[in-house]
A protein has these predicted regions:
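Active-site nucleophile and cofactor-binding loops and adjacent substrate-binding regions
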Residues: 1, 132, 174-177
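Short amphipathic alpha-helical face segments that pack within enzyme cores
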Residues: 2-9, 25, 180-187
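An anion/pyrophosphate-binding glycine-rich loop and adjacent beta-alpha core
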Residues: 6, 12-123, 191-197
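Structural beta-strand/beta-sheet cores of well-ordered domains, especially the beta-sheet scaffolds
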Residues: 11, 19, 42-44, 91-93, ...
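Beta-strand segments within the central parallel beta-sheet cores of soluble alpha/beta enzyme folds
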Residues: 17-24, 129-130, 202-211
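A gly/ser-rich beta-alpha-beta helix-loop segment of oxidoreductase catalytic cores
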Residues: 28-42, 131-146, 318
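Glycine- and aromatic-enriched mobile tails/lids
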Residues: 47-70, 75, 84, 137-139, ...
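Accessory "access/gating" subregions that flank catalytic or transport cores
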Residues: 100, 104-147, 151-154
Length: 428
């Protein structure tokens, strides 16, 4: 989170949707290293302490192939029901891929085989893999426009997981992070080059401003180096991790999150009483303390945003507000750290414009239809259906239809505005 914290501490750049934290269902236990979604995609099964395959009981349609947030919640529910496998480091469940066969595992899931062998001493061709959901990805980041540039700080660009540019919304489908990295790097890289090539974007900053900024950073470092307080950065960070795991995790409740915000704020204040004892040379202790304060600011953006969002959406699930509320909460959370001495971020919101969506919000395709509809959704869906039917009758291809529903080609760098298909594998 250092990149997000650097942007946040500018006081100008904003962070978006920081409460949208995704947990991956199958982190090997207790190491937390992920095993790919491909295990379940290829037919792997989740089992409890009795060896029972439980996902068909709770998600009869999608089973193990439900989205990450759903599978993670179902796994934690199973453990809470007393069906977890007890071990030295806590409880876990089983991922069974033995039924896929040794050849398939060693050739198609070779990385999984090696991870289990080296980190667990487990042979997944013969043994079940101990797994439990682990924090994996954040849909939040530096709030940018489609070019990757901050909406509020000219010349600041962010791409990939460091950004919030609306590729994933409040949840991310498995396998899309590499695609985002490649696409974002390609598109945003072009826009950065274009930005630097325009004379009007030339850097015209007084030298004094640079010296002032450097002096502020040095003052922060000196604050650690010359501190005579008695707080411990390692203990502060450990407690921060405990709070985020227990109170801002897969299941969230208002009172827990409010408590988390209060305690995280206290921890942030304590970082101003952290002394750095070892000073000469490359100072890892100073780096640790410096980053811990930044982590706490990012954690506060996450916790406060989660506490304020009174609904469940994607990876953000509240037990006290289990319904997705498109009528009141179809909006992005924006976090700003306005003043250097603030101990909490300032939140604001951006409403989403349904009239510009290619896929207006609706039923996710599994479970009960427990969401509050936005009154604009039926209208937009009717517009899309009518436009699609008209253009299909006129013989338009899917590229033209998509561009008519949600124009985007003109927004891309000119070099990338052609059809996106492999030469030897045309999509039509």
């Amino acid at each position: 989170g250092t990149g997000a914290a650097l942007a946040l501490e500018s006081g100008v750049a904003t962070l978006g949707n920081m409460e949208a934290i995704q947990f991956h269902p199958t982190g090997i236990f207790p190491a937390g290293i992920l095993v790919t979604e491909g295990c379940r995609g290829d037919g792997g099964l989740l089992r409890d302490c009795d060896g029972h395959r439980f996902m068909p009981d709770v998600e009869p349609e999608k089973k193990e192939l439900a989205s990450r947030d759903v599978v993670s919640r179902r796994m934690e529910e199973r453990i809470a029901q007393g069906k977890g496998v007890k071990g030295r480091f806590g409880e876990h469940l089983w991922l069974d891929i033995t039924l896929l066969g040794e050849h398939h595992i060693k050739h198609n899931l070779r990385e999984v085989y090696e991870i289990c062998h080296y980190f667990l001493g487990v042979d997944p061709t013969k043994e079940w893999i101990p797994v439990r959901p682990a924090m994996h990805y954040t849909m939040g980041g530096v709030r940018t426009n489609y070019t990757g540039e901050s909406r509020t700080l000219k010349g600041l660009f962010a791409a990939g997981e460091a950004s919030c540019w609306d590729m994933h919304g409040f949840n991310r489908l498995g396998g899309n992070s590499v695609a985002e990295t490649v696409v974002a790097g390609m598109i945003v890289g072009e826009f950065i080059a274009d930005f630097c090539d325009k004379p009007e974007n030339g850097i015209d900053i007084p030298t004094s401003l640079i010296y002032d900024a450097a002096a502020k950073v040095q003052a922060t470092l000196d604050g650690f180096l010359h501190n005579t307080g008695n707080e411990d950065a390692a203990k502060i960070r450990a407690r921060m991790q405990e709070i985020m795991t227990s109170k801002i995790g897969i299941f969230r409740r208002g009172e827990d999150m409010e408590s988390a915000v209060s305690e995280l704020e206290d921890l942030l204040k304590k970082t101003y009483n952290v002394p750095v004892k070892y000073q000469p040379g490359a100072n890892s202790e100073l780096t640790y303390a410096y980053r811990t304060r930044k982590m706490l600011k990012v954690a506060l953006c996450t916790a406060l945003g989660a506490a304020a969002r009174k609904e469940s959406r994607g990876a953000h699930f509240r037990e006290d507000y289990p319904v997705r509320d498109d009528k009141h909460w179809l909006k992005r959370t924006i976090a700003t750290w306005k003043n250097e001495n603030d101990t909490l971020p300032t939140l604001s919101y951006e409403n989403l414009d349904i009239s510009k969506m290619e896929l207006p919000p609706g039923w996710r395709g599994y479970g009960a239809k427990n969401y509050i509809d936005n009154p604009e959704t039926p209208k937009r869906q009717a517009e899309i259906d009518a436009l699609r039917a008209k253009m299909e009758a006129e013989g338009a291809d899917r590229y033209a239809i998509q561009d008519a529903i949600m124009p985007f080609h003109s927004l891309l760098p000119k070099r990338l505005q052609g059809r996106n298909e492999r030469i030897d594998e045309p999509l039509e």
